[in-house]
């Protein structure tokens, strides 16, 4: 079972889309790997401009499918970005791109004691 870090960005929170996204079931440190990119300062300013709704999702290979492509224009309908986004710079949600990055990003935002062990009985009927 894979885990990934997911954050609804300030534009998604301000637009009141947290509930809609949920139906799909330290910004500077988080984006440190992008520090040499020309858009880094603007990205940090944007990610600090308002509240961020952070969470960890778990599933088997479904996270990218649910989020959609980074560019909303390339995202399929039925994905979060395909349904709710119109601009690559304001694509409302961040999702870890690899399992390794997910572990690092989850560690930046959450402490181990903040997780609750929850054994969902339906998983045995859904996943082999």
Swiss-Prot record:
Zinc in keyword set: no
Species of origin reads: Merluccius hubbsi
Q: Where does ATP bind?
A: 9, 39, 70, 81, 91
Catalyses which reaction?
a 2'-deoxyribonucleoside 5'-diphosphate + ATP = a 2'-deoxyribonucleoside 5'-triphosphate + ADP; a ribonucleoside 5'-diphosphate + ATP = a ribonucleoside 5'-triphosphate + ADP
> What's the domain of life for this entry?
Eukaryota
Q: Which Pfam families match?
A: NDK
The Swiss-Prot or TrEMBL record describes its family as follows: Belongs to the NDK family.
The UniProt keywords, alphabetically, are: Acetylation, ATP-binding, Cell cycle, Cell projection, Cytoplasm, Kinase, Magnesium, Metal-binding, Nucleotide metabolism, Nucleotide-binding, Nucleus, Phosphoprotein, Transferase
The name on file for this protein is Nucleoside diphosphate kinase B
Statement: the UniProt record of this protein carries the keyword ATP-binding: yes
GO MF terms listed in the record are:
ATP binding; metal ion binding; nucleoside diphosphate kinase activity
Q: What Gene Ontology cellular component terms go with this record? A: cytoplasm; lamellipodium; nucleus; ruffle
CDD domains, alphabetized: NDPk_I
Per its UniProt record, what SUPFAM superfamilies does this chain match? Nucleoside diphosphate kinase, NDK (SSF54919)
Where in the cell? Cytoplasm; Nucleus; Cell projection, Lamellipodium; Cell projection, Ruffle
Q: What is its EC number?
A: 2.7.4.6
Task: State the encoding gene.
Answer: nme2
Q: Which InterPro entries match?
A: NDK-like_dom, NDK-like_dom_sf
- According to the UniProt entry, which residues carry N-acetylmethionine? 1
Q: What cofactors does this protein use?
A: Mg(2+)
Note the SMART domains from the entry: NDK (SM00562)
Say what the protein does.
Major role in the synthesis of nucleoside triphosphates other than ATP.
Q: Which residues form the active site?
A: 94
GO biological process entries: nucleotide metabolic process
